[in-house]
């Protein structure tokens, strides 16, 4: 055994699964589901009765949490669906670069520089205007299935 120290900086999620299985019949409105390989928030669920040939079916209508597109899927209620691990994290906004990336302060005091400004015009203008006015802004970043996007903004007062 050597006395050397080994330092690892984790940039990956250690191969953890981006989704978990859940029975279709137990997924409810406002939950999450993967439809056509996209993480979606469930807006509507309707269940059809068991037919002559087989299972009751669940009809899901979801909105992609990153691009806002409406997606639909029909799954037998006894089958498993993929449900994305969705995380929401708040970061303080430090800077906006000219190429459209933001610089964010993490809880540990490090910076996160790999996120683009949001494409939503309303949110984009709120962030740019608030930053230009020198306000202290906190952005919420939603992450699921290897994607991250700024989804909301909080003003925590003027900078001192």
Swiss-Prot record:
Region annotation (Disordered) maps to 1-21
> Which key words are in the record?
Hypusine, Initiation factor, Protein biosynthesis
* Residues where Hypusine is found: 52
What GO terms are given for molecular function? Answer: ribosome binding; RNA binding; translation elongation factor activity; translation initiation factor activity
Query: Keyword Metal-binding: yes or no?
Result: no
Matching PROSITE patterns:
IF5A_HYPUSINE
What CDD domains does the entry give? Answer: S1_eIF5A (cd04468)
Checking SMART domains in the record gives: eIF-5a
Q: Which Gene3D superfamilies does UniProt cross-reference here?
A: 2.30.30.30, Nucleic acid-binding proteins (2.40.50.140)
Which terms does the UniProt entry file under GO BP?
A: positive regulation of translational elongation; positive regulation of translational termination
Feature: compositional bias, Basic and acidic residues? 1-12
Q: What does this protein do?
A: Translation factor that promotes translation elongation and termination, particularly upon ribosome stalling at specific amino acid sequence contexts. Binds between the exit (E) and peptidyl (P) site of the ribosome and promotes rescue of stalled ribosome: specifically required for efficient translation of polyproline-containing peptides as well as other motifs that stall the ribosome. Acts as a ribosome quality control (RQC) cofactor by joining the RQC complex to facilitate peptidyl transfer during CAT tailing step.
Q: Family, per the entry?
A: Belongs to the eIF-5A family.
Name the record gives this protein: Eukaryotic translation initiation factor 5A
At the highest ranks, the source species' classification is: Eukaryota, Viridiplantae, Streptophyta, Embryophyta, Tracheophyta
């Amino acid at each position: 055994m050597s006395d050397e120290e080994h330092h690892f900086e984790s940039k990956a999620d250690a191969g953890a699964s981006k989704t978990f299985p859940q029975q279709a019949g137990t997924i409810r409105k406002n939950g999450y589901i993967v439809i056509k390989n996209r993480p979606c928030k469930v807006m509507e669920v309707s269940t059809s009765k068991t037919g002559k040939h087989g299972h009751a079916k669940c009809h899901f209508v979801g909105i992609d949490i990153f691009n806002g597109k409406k997606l639909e899927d029909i799954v037998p209620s006894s089958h498993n669906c993929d449900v994305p691990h969705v995380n929401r994290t708040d970061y303080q906004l430090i800077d906006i670069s000219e190429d459209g990336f933001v610089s964010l302060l993490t809880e540990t005091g490090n910076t996160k520089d790999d996120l683009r400004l949001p494409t939503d015009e309303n949110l984009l203008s709120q962030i740019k205007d608030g930053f230009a006015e020198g306000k202290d802004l906190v952005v919420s970043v939603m992450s699921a299935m290897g994607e991250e996007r700024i989804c909301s903004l909080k003003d925590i007062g003027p900078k001192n």
